[in-house]
Amino acid sequence: PSLIQAKSQYPLSYGKANYAFTLRLNDTKLLNSLLKTPITSSHAMRLTGIVRERQHELDLNVNAPDVTYKGQQIKKLLLNINSEPQGLVTTISAERKGEQGPHILINAQGLIADNTISSDISFRIPGLAPIYGNINSEASFSRLHGDLKTRLHLNPSKINFDSITLQVQPSDISYHRNYLTIDHFELSNNNQHIIANGQPSGNQNDSILVRFKDV
């Protein structure tokens, strides 16, 4: 609720039915009309799901072979959202491919509940010196003076540059009204490490302190 405050333009109804649905979208006109998005697709998209109104539960599966959003081409997109007692359990896999930006393969699992998104993201950037790893994090959302405030907590994670493994140490990054605050962002490899702290918001009084050891 902190992330999306806008009220729905469609009337809400409450029932007690259970039903399943399958939807094939040969184009994205309906999707863009509902979501106010500029999505295009060269292949048909398929949506399947089960709704249990009495329990307020939803199981949703999306298969989009090739979609483009704001110039970003996403291929082999698979999205699953399932209602569980602890929140919405989500899995997603996709391949970003195109002339703009790097080729990236991604697999992610997440839990959405109580203004918080907990996620574990595995990624791979192919090439002669591949980059791959996983990022485990928890993003929380709130409202401060009416504006969205985002806090990202990074849990221990790994990023591999070819044969070099970097450890991502626990750290916090927060953002509110163009103010980005970095609290002890650290990458380490045995005795080598890079540590960053500060506030890079563009104000002339802001600063970032970066410390290097054996780099």
Predicted regions mapped to residue ranges:
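Interface amphipathic segments
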Residues: 1-215
